[in-house]
Amino acid sequence: MSSTFSDSTSEPNAPITPAVDDDTCVAAAPLDFSGASLFFPENFAGSTLRTDAPIGSPQSAAEAAALSDALCAKISPISFGDRVFLLPSESDAWRVAVEMVRRYHRLVGRAKRRRFIVCVGPADATASLPPGFEGDDEIVTLRTDDHAALQAEVDVRTAAILIAPVRTQAGFEVVSGSVLARLRETADEYGLILAFDETFCGLGRSGMLWAHEWTGVTPDLMVARHSPADAPPLAALVVTQRLARGALGGSALAEGDALLAGHALIDALSTPGFQERVQNRSWYLEDQLSALFYRRRAAFTALDGLGLMQALTLAGDAEPMRAKLAAHGLLTRAMGSVLGLFPPLTVEESDIDAAVSCIEMVCAQEER
């Protein structure tokens, strides 16, 4: 499910093992570690993943609504939420979320509460907002995680606090559990809604189904996103029963093909042993990158990550290295000075070995 906290999706590519010699690691086909897809297409379509979704696209609005209700019923038990709303895009999800929060406050007698504080963090100099927030003059961006600064922004007009548990726009940052816990305390103290943007870090990428589960901090509202290569995008707005009081009818229904892909995704994520497999691959990726980092200290200044979201920090701009890796068949993501590696959940150890070998070769070429 791409926000302005993350890059837009692109066509995923099949996994490969690059052929490496002394001068090149050019791959027969790109190996996509850019985060564009949750699954390698052939893995997702294969019989190893259980997909209980009905066959064929729904032919009527009633069929689509039934498919949507069934998917909501699958998502709610595996999340904190009591209610789930499925929308055709992330922009739609955030617009519905904003109106739901504001309407909730009106219903409980706090009509002045309309402002959203978006905690973008100190690394985001441009303070970009999630899609759907454009043109709303009651959105405030906070470029620090200092708790005193946050409390200074809270006033009688504040309705909600929004943060991404893992930030991936201007760089890469796993927001600490202590920061999220303080936001939860502030929201509870002032009667605010705590919203999490899990459009990139949710749905298993962190090694758990939802990234915030690592911290033990539970939001009131969350938006997640799925953008498969062969189906329309799908966004999920997950909320507590208390907040759902502010829901309005008439929201745009997600497309039938998107709902089918959503069923397949949730069924795969719910397959016994699947999340354990993702965690094992996460540890393997982290181990291999840690070894690379210590071998190539001249190239990288830091390594950070959570699950299948790992980031190598360079002394300068990461874009030149991203371009060189792409030329050799490894797709990554440049985020300022950070090179992001976000493989699909179905990544194999051989894919990780191939990616690390490619990075190692490019580093060796640059040191010559």
Where are these regions (language model features)?
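Conserved N-terminal phosphate-binding loop of PLP-dependent enzymes in the Aspartate aminotransferase
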Residues: S2-R368
